[in-house]
């Protein structure tokens, strides 16, 4: 990657909040030849959630002899774009680190995937401190320091120890000889002990040059010597001093109080590393041999605990802790006064450990930023900072104050990875955070002069199109990733939709655009920083590197692209450690449009691997796509999701994520929003000039109480019944009005007059149904035959009408329609007779005679029409009817 490309990428960092990237402490390396670790590595304790880009194995400090070749190894969680190594010579400890040129005679760098190896020839100019630097796009991650030291062994004050020691003790005593006090070795020497020139096995290991003989006897008498060996160089040193020990029988010895022998220390001071085993040895002899009691005024329960063991003159404490530091007293008493007290001062050193890592949010350019880094360790660790691999001491805007880094004015060049290092003589520990810088918006320059006056026909200045931030990429599966981006707060043109574009890194690789339109949603900001969005991209190829960008489409149908993301290498899932899976505990009904998710992690889950969580939700009745929400921070255990539909059941699932991968989904869990609450509070009356601008939501518009619904339904039924009643009454009145027409044909009259009213009457009266039985007169058949013959010869005969006389029965209510039709035909036939019917029907005869007189010139065709009856109950007992029975 060229310097220009690196600079451009530095201004377009990942925008979603990435938590600190802990640099794990050193794990055992594979030194070449006789190289040995200078200090054992302390356990790794990641101090903060990691986005997946971190140092898995930092180079380890080594001690090697001159002319040897050593190998420093560095491994990262993801394959970087490139590795670099820097060096600071031990000849100039105050100087800064310088990047090494690879391929030289004294340093050779090789890379295999995510592992880089530096081969160094041990020379005086190659001794010093080394760092491994991994480049991940705009991010620069630096490892902790590895020291390369020269193996050495030397004697101190050798002349004073040339004369041999001569001790005479009674049998049964324990003897402590410190033969290695004059030796200085790097690394610590290993010891061998000899009696009369024959090597003997010591009772305790790790005595650091102290020979301890317990319960001596006459067989223990002899000449003792010791030898130190450097484990790195193999160099051996035979100490000139020796011990002549003479053991006498206890019966021949006179009584003596406990006392120290010549050359034995009156007090001791021991320094040990936390986690190691501590062995305290008590010097002193007496006659008879004294009894030893151990105690400590500083450490409560120092002797009587599971980690402590007493072996007479020896006290062993395993897995030493910091609170084990203090003064220990060895009290010796044999009944002869005075008793002997021996004091041993114990110091427990602790490697540095960062307990409060730095944390940086999105910071505006020009703002003041204060980062804190708190660490523990014995001795108290020194804190220093790196900004994208460069020391903060060289930055003019940076100030160091105790555990704080203060940037008085955040600039674009500060964007990147900020690391805090805690250092003491036992080693280093590191943690970092991603510093995101929101650049200042460049305003269009105005014309110089006084008040700006718009030119004629010049419209208002168009709003700017503010692009979204570069997306942050998280692996979801072997073929898909999740993108997160943000639209910073602005007053520019509103965004309508987003499109996601991606391309595979390589020559002649074009940008691909996904088919999905990602809506902007409601025009409001989710937080003070802006509004965040997420989208997934599928159908990718594993073990390939991609870049992503976001295309924003604005309300003026124009579009603008975000800066491209950093290179993202899509690793297969088999190469990644599984992420902790969250467990959904409860879906709390928060309000009518919101719920709160509550979840937990397993007790053995490593929370430091998590950057945040993805929440997926959709209505339970839907089989469509899930809505997504991003929850930042590994410590989050609850999250409110809104807005949702009122009184609707939803299903939810969670997964944790980091920049490298995402976990499996949690089990589905259902929950619902609250039902609407009925309120009896009266709405305030709007005054003149006031207007209620509240717009009800979709759910509130159609949400009615059951009582109101029943009232409206009952009213609708009553209205329908009233309309039906009115319709029947009107129809009855129309039937009556049609019956009063004198010119209406007789067939229609009879139908209308005898239409039953029982079907449409609102109130039905219970009355006995009256049946009318009509029997035709035999004379009517003869009259009908004569009438038909006349009709054939005379088609134009006029009609004459004479009122007919009927008996009226006011109690008659109903009549059979079929009987009425037969009666009608009978009456019409009877009207055509000649009137000589022997007086059976006087009314008909009168009508016929009247008709002949009024029209003498016409043939005698007479049709009798009955006038309108005054009631629906009639007694047809005259004319051509023979009998009427009711």
Swiss-Prot record:
Pfam families: fn3 (PF00041), Ig_2 (PF13895), Ig_3 (PF13927). Disruption phenotype: Patterning defects characteristic of Hh signaling loss in embryos and imaginal disks. It is found in: Membrane. It is a single-pass type I membrane protein. Residues 731-886 are cytoplasmic. One of its GO terms (biological process) is homotypic cell-cell adhesion. The first Fibronectin type-III domain mediates a specific interaction with Hh protein, in vitro. The second Fibronectin type-III domain is additionally required for in vivo signaling activity. Residues 29-52, 432-475, 668-697, 734-768, 781-886 are annotated as: Disordered. GO terms for molecular function: coreceptor activity; hedgehog family protein binding; heparin binding; identical protein binding; patched binding; protein homodimerization activity. Homodimer. Heterotetramer; 2 iHog chains bind 2 hh chains when facilitated by heparin, heparin is required to promote high-affinity interactions between hh and iHog. It comes from the Eukaryota. It comes from Drosophila melanogaster. Glycans are attached at residues 108, 215, 472, 563, 699. One of its GO terms (cellular component) is axon. Changing residue 507 to E: Loss of Heparin binding. Heparin binds at residues 503, 507, 509, 547. This is Interference hedgehog. Residues 467-573, 581-676 form the Fibronectin type-III domain. Residues 671-684 have a biased composition (Polar residues). Residues 29-38, 829-843, 870-886 have a biased composition (Low complexity). PANTHER family: BROTHER OF IHOG, ISOFORM G-RELATED, PROTEIN SIDEKICK. CDD domains: FN3. Belongs to the immunoglobulin superfamily. IHOG family. The keyword Transmembrane applies. Disulfide bonds join 74-132, 179-226, 282-330, 373-420.
